[in-house]
């Protein structure tokens, strides 16, 4: 682990398929806690933000730097931002730095949680645009201008706590264009590809230094048909996503995938899930290393224990499988990057649990697993 107090806190950079910082390899051993900004916006819950960061014992957190419309929105309307909520994001970034933790900041959502592309399309309709689908988010010029303005506002933000511009702050490991984008209205992938290329270029024009990832789940698309059987189902190949083609967009630095076999696979035979995870991970690692030449970031992975179909024992077997495959490839020098669990919570945030949350105080065996993976990375 880096220590910002004893080492110069430098940007994480990409060297081929590896990540480096402060003159040595950097491996992501991280987690997701998406609600940090919204909790920081309320004095009653702000301490849980510090707890989430300080108690994790990991080195990277992925969190949402967006909240579009609705309660305590950061973006209240196109080109209009709530300064109090922006200051909450400032607090999150400053707390991460204080605890030697890097951040991956996501800039939008494919889903309706915290607004997302649906909210952008609603704003467009309110402005008189002739929009027929949420997928118009990816193609309408006016909607794209809304997104670009928001991205610029975040990336060029001067942190009121540290007085450092976000685009100059090494606490931020990477920007994420959008969480889990899909565009099923154009299964060819052309619409989403054009959007990714345009937005990657735009982000890099403002901030050429920070790393950039897309945020896709990693489904294979029509550009390489022989890889379609790796997908969990036939629908995945028609979602407008194309793992190889998407990551060939200029400006993208990290190959991002998610792993949710409990959602993607209909059956509950545990061994089938672990076999799928093994194949899914291995194929993407091979492709990231050999076809794309970039690190892989398993940006989200987890198992819900909410409905009783799977328990904590299986969740831990699932996690061990993810970590084992990544660790093996990294030790062999094949790939760098890392993995971020969905999700890790301090006490007092249980009401935000979607079934996937690992609560610090209630999950000693899972925390032991996380600590063991850290030891393996450091040995």
UniProtKB/Swiss-Prot annotation:
Record's catalysed reaction(s): Random hydrolysis of (1->4)-beta-D-mannosidic linkages in mannans, galactomannans and glucomannans
Annotated binding of substrate, by residue: 64, 179, 260, 342
Tissue: Expression not detected.
Catalytic residues of the enzyme: 180 (proton donor), 300 (nucleophile)
Transmembrane segments: none
Class in the EC hierarchy, top level: hydrolase
Alphabetic keyword roster: Glycosidase, Hydrolase
GO molecular function: mannan endo-1,4-beta-mannosidase activity
A Pfam family annotated for this UniProt entry: Cellulase
Annotated EC: 3.2.1.78
One GO BP: polysaccharide catabolic process
Similarity annotation: Belongs to the glycosyl hydrolase 5 (cellulase A) family.
Protein name in UniProt: Mannan endo-1,4-beta-mannosidase 7
Annotated organism of origin: Oryza sativa subsp. japonica
Gene that this sequence comes from: MAN7
